[in-house]
UniProtKB/Swiss-Prot annotation:
Keywords: Acetylation, ATP-binding, GTP-binding, Kinase, Mitochondrion, Nucleotide-binding, Transferase. It comes from Homo sapiens (Human). This is Adenylate kinase 4, mitochondrial. The modification N6-acetyllysine is found at residues 175, 179, 186. Belongs to the adenylate kinase family. AK3 subfamily. The modification N6-succinyllysine is found at residues 60, 179, 186. Broad-specificity mitochondrial nucleoside phosphate kinase involved in cellular nucleotide homeostasis by catalyzing nucleoside-phosphate interconversions. Similar to other adenylate kinases, preferentially catalyzes the phosphorylation of the nucleoside monophosphate AMP with ATP as phosphate donor to produce ADP. Phosphorylates only AMP when using GTP as phosphate donor. In vitro, can also catalyze the phosphorylation of CMP, dAMP and dCMP and use GTP as an alternate phosphate donor. The lineage of its organism: Eukaryota, Metazoa, Chordata, Craniata, Vertebrata.
Length: 223
């Protein structure tokens, strides 16, 4: 098994189960799960310069532009030069992918392809705890108490863009922006696409893929 550092990326539309898959990869293989959403929340909370820049867009329900999110993620990656990692939420655009190219070579890219109806159903059942970014699904990951965050006891909310009428627009936007990123990694031979309606059925194939690249840190596959 090669000892070089593994640099991986996960791509997928809202509701595709990226967060769950990332948690399992981190748990089974020891990769650092680097979520752009998590870093954005941390920087906004700490009122950093990049956090204040991002906040202006988020408050207007606009996408954070490439130059802001790229600056944020480059800083985080510089601090993790000696680690195996898995990027979640970055790169979202071709510009972000090209910026990532300048500091490292991506070894492995996972793209999750989930049917539209499944995504729509999942998102309509999704509730979040905004301060932490914790996500719950009423079907397969419900909170212990309905409408309440397990950790803080604070109320959960449903995002406006998770409501059915907004989902179709979000998915169209994702496809338009993600297509050139997917094509880029496909042309390099590092893209692996997984299709299905259930994360538990996709996961064994993801586990096998990573097992061929890096030694699992657990003797038994963890879910």
């Amino acid at each position: 098994m090669a000892s070089k550092l593994l640099r991986a990326v996960i791509l997928g539309p809202p509701g595709s189960g990226k967060g769950t898959v990332c948690q399992r990869i981190a748990q089974n293989f020891g990769l650092q799960h680097l979520s752009s959403g998590h870093f954005l929340r941390e920087n906004i909370k700490a009122s950093t310069e990049v956090g204040e820049m991002a906040k202006q867009y988020i408050e207007k329900s606009l996408l954070v532009p490439d130059h802001v999110i790229t600056r944020l993620m480059m800083s985080e990656l510089e601090n993790r030069r000696g680690q195996h990692w898995l990027l979640d939420g970055f790169p979202r655009t071709l510009g972000q992918a090209e910026a990532l190219d300048k500091i490292c070579e991506v070894d492995l890219v996972i793209s999750l392809n989930i049917p539209f109806e499944t995504l729509k159903d999942r998102l309509s059942r999704r509730w979040i705890h905004p301060p932490s970014g914790r996500v719950y699904n009423l079907d397969f990951n419900p909170p212990h108490v309905h409408g309440i965050d397990d950790v803080t006891g604070e109320p959960l909310v449903q995002q406006e863009d998770d409501k059915p009428e907004a989902v179709a627009a979000r998915l169209r936007q994702y496809k338009d922006v993600a297509k050139p990123v997917i094509e880029l990694y496909k042309s390099r031979g590092v893209l692996h696409q997984f299709s299905g309606t259930e994360t538990n059925k996709i996961w064994p194939y993801v586990y096998t893929l990573f097992s061929n690249k890096i030694t699992p840190i657990q003797s038994k596959e963890a879910y």
